[in-house]
């Protein structure tokens, strides 16, 4: 009888521990920063954040300002002009080229002029303005702009003093602003374009590379699933391209999955694959592509109805096979909207987006919970 009592006592203890573990919630308070819901934040390095405090989000309880936080302390703050709510024409955003070049972009909707100001040595520079189409890509050595003129598309490169370095004509298929583009060491440009015509049931993506004078070097056509979101892209230093986009089956709201396509610098398609998990929404949000075609992808896996909230990191080889996986739990006291972001040094963080105080959690701080069966096919 004593042995039986000890057995049941041990069983109850194990069950209570298991229940406590299953209901454990991650405390985000140590990771919260002073912010409002959907406040723009850029991660510069561990515990260093560039924050755009927007008075319109908090009823001007806190003034619109550019703030630099270092380990939770404000080391820089500059108030910005408030816009009248009945006639706004100025918008602010943040930009980061690398760990040393970052700052504020101010866009004037009435003149289509964008002003870029770097934050250097505790001072916001006077900056420079560029007029025209408002889609820019900040890179360590230059600022790129997608420019349309007289029915043609150009990628223009400016140095960080605002001086035009080059203007490269690109394909008639317009580069999508949200897919990204990059300038390689030989001044050629790699970029992603998509060509979607719903009436003709045509869904295509292109990985493109052009020389500095606009000569087409490679074009890789890729068929897409018929319901996709805006594709994003990662580029290797030698011009390889990895595009990724959320997708779903026609007519279904959930679950959605991620569609991946990778090509090399010579315009050869390495693979196209769909990353899925049964009854779970998967979204790739960040990727790093290397010269040999291997890649690291980060993303979220969630299903609110199942109270399943995870983030993941997958290592892929050049053929798109999963070499290793790292899945972390992100169960919190509320059903947050969250994403995975990288800083310029390559460190990964989980960032909440829909709470009054944004939390930025280093990926490595989250508990391992590998309970997802990934399918990459």
Residue positions per predicted region:
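An edge-strand/N-cap motif at the start of beta-rich repeat modules
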Residues: 22-57, 72
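Repeated scaffold domains used in trafficking and secretory/extracellular systems
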Residues: 35-44, 85-97, 130-140, 174-184, ...
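Short glycine/acidic-enriched loop and turn motifs that connect beta-strands
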Residues: 55-60, 107-111, 149-152, 195-200, ...
